Regions:
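Hydrophobic alpha-helical membrane context
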Residues: 18-19, 68, 195, 469
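Intrinsic disorder/low-complexity segments enriched in polar/small residues
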Residues: 4-8, 89, 184, 495
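Outer-membrane beta-barrel porins/channels
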Residues: 26-39, 43, 47-48, 112, ...
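N-terminal, post-signal peptide beta-strand-biased segments of exported outer-membrane/organellar beta-barrel
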Residues: 20-132, 136-138, 435, 461
Length: 497
């Protein structure tokens, strides 16, 4: 009955330590909302504007001569919801006998800043961009995750022969992750129709992750007792059983009779059970993890823009940024468990930002109305992530974008657009500690030209996510359903001198 106790011990450590990927918004989900112009119309890949310092840097060369400065502020609110089914949840004190439980994480990013600047002179455009192309906030699961509770529930289930009938626990997980991007580059206007761009982006990543299981209780015939006391009582019971068997073996040996195989097997089983219980003693007071990570990476960016008639075409390629996050962690010793070693103190972990290809087209239908189209591809499988998790994907991420702008007056422009995001996910890749799901997004907003030198901007962007359902086993049913929500509000100001 207790031969799998070591697996439970491994699962406890693995589940807790793997939480460090929860709040990561980089990975295969790269932030592209780097300006208010994107919020109000995400199809900016061939648009001519200051926000092009990020989305279409070659096209910035076609802006008027002078200094251009854009300042953007965004507020983002996300929820991440996992509905988990597991028969061991029915043993939970707070679950009312239900095998299904909802775990919700709330992620708030109250301030996502970005700055775009360009100085155009003659055929040259010198550009700078500061943004948060990955992460951007913190995510908190106040009740932990299903992978946390399933571990405790499985332990309670395995301890039933020793009198356990249920469990209680408190779980908690929080992750905070930011990738700050600093981009410098130059565009050159080859002709009135063609421009090219080359630049570098430096990414500085910083993250903090906390995971906790506390107040673990075991239900018995006498009521709930703390996990440590239960283990001590169980160990006392096992010691008594082992002593009785040893006494029986001694009697056989004293009589010169062979010891029955059943007796030695019972002793081996009880001793193995005791050893497994001893391995769980370290969790009698719960589990705490604290891990800080940081790293720096640099990658080149190239772009091109071509105009003809009422059309503008553009493309941009961002090379892969190699990121090796260095840990400062409460995990100090090496372990046979890979998930533990991922967060070992002073270890460096691969967390590359994948390469990206963006292409776009803009059509000036009239002098006042513009139609925008775009396509993004992220080369996720060519990135290097810890334990080669990129190999669990079926392919890279694809995004399809469309939008329209209308100059109602010389001062007021309104716009709207949509973005369709498709990941190539697999059940093996998905888990409740780090997940994305397919989605479509809608954005709208306006520009108001307050003067010849000042333009005010506002936009709203909402993402609607699908559900991803994963069934681990059918008998008994162990499954998860993943989904999210995302809403972003932003304001900005653009100055031209």
């Amino acid at each position: 009955m207790f031969k799998d106790m070591k697996k439970i011990y491994v699962l406890v450590a693995s589940a807790l330590l793997a939480t460090a990927t929860t709040a990561t918004a980089g990975g295969i989900l790269t932030n592209t909302n780097q300006s208010i112009d994107f919020l109000r119309n995400p199809a900016r890949d061939a648009a001519i504007g200051l926000d092009g310092v990020y989305s279409n840097p070659a096209g910035v060369a076609f802006l008027p001569e002078g200094f251009h400065l854009g300042i953007n502020w965004q507020y983002a609110h996300q929820t991440r919801t996992i509905t988990s089914n597991n028969p061991v949840f029915a043993l939970g004190r707070k679950n009312g006998g239900n095998t299904a439980k909802v775990f919700e994480g709330v992620a708030d990013a109250p301030c996502i800043p970005s700055i775009q600047a360009a100085y155009n002179k003659g055929n040259w455009s010198m550009q700078f961009n500061f943004s948060v192309p990955g992460g951007g906030g913190s995510c908190e699961f106040a009740d932990g995750l299903g992978s946390f509770e399933s571990v405790v529930g499985s332990i309670a289930n395995m301890l039933q022969p020793l009198g356990a009938t249920g469990y209680d626990m408190d779980g908690y997980m929080q992750g905070r992750n930011y990738y700050f991007g600093f981009q410098l580059g130059t565009a050159y206007k080859v002709s009135d129709q063609l421009s090219v761009y080359g630049g570098l982006r430096l990414l500085y990543g910083t993250a903090t992750y906390k995971a906790k299981i506390s107040n673990i209780m075991v239900n018995t015939a006498g009521g709930y007792v703390d996990f440590g006391s239960f283990l001590q009582g169980a160990e006392t019971t096992l010691d008594g059983g082992i002593s009785q068997i040893n006494a029986g073996i001694a009697q056989y040996e004293a009589a010169g009779a062979p010891v029955p195989v059943e007796l030695t097997a019972q002793k081996a089983q009880l001793e193995g059970t005791k050893q497994s219980l001893n391995a769980l003693q370290k969790y009698s007071q719960g589990v705490n993890l604290l891990c800080n990570q940081s790293s720096v990476g640099v990658a080149p960016i190239i772009g091109i823009d071509y105009k003809f008639g009422r059309f503008n075409l553009a493309a941009k390629y961002e090379f892969k940024t190699e990121i090796h996050m260095k840990n400062e962690s409460t995990v100090n010793e090496a372990s046979e468990i890979p998930a533990v070693n991922k967060f070992r103190d002073a270890e460096k972990i691969d967390e590359d930002s994948p390469a990206q290809l963006a292409v776009g087209a803009m059509w000036n239908i009239t002098d006042d109305v513009r139609l925008n189209l775009g396509y993004h591809h992220f080369y996720d499988k060519d990135a290097n992530w810890y334990n080669n998790t990129q190999d669990l994907l079926d392919g890279g991420t694809n995004e399809y974008l469309a939008g329209v702008e209308w100059d109602i007056t010389d001062r007021l422009t309104v716009s709207g657009g949509t973005q369709l995001t498709r990941y190539q996910l697999t059940d093996a890749y998905m888990n409740d500690m780090s997940f994305v799901v397919n989605s479509y997004s809608l954005g709208f907003g306006f520009n108001y030209k307050a003067s010849d030198h000042v333009t005010l901007k506002a936009g709203y962007f909402q993402t609607n996510y699908e559900n991803y359902d994963r069934v681990t086993t059918k008998e008994p049913l162990v499954s998860d359903s993943f989904t999210r929500t995302n809403r972003v509000l932003g304001i900005g100001c653009e100055l031209a001198f």
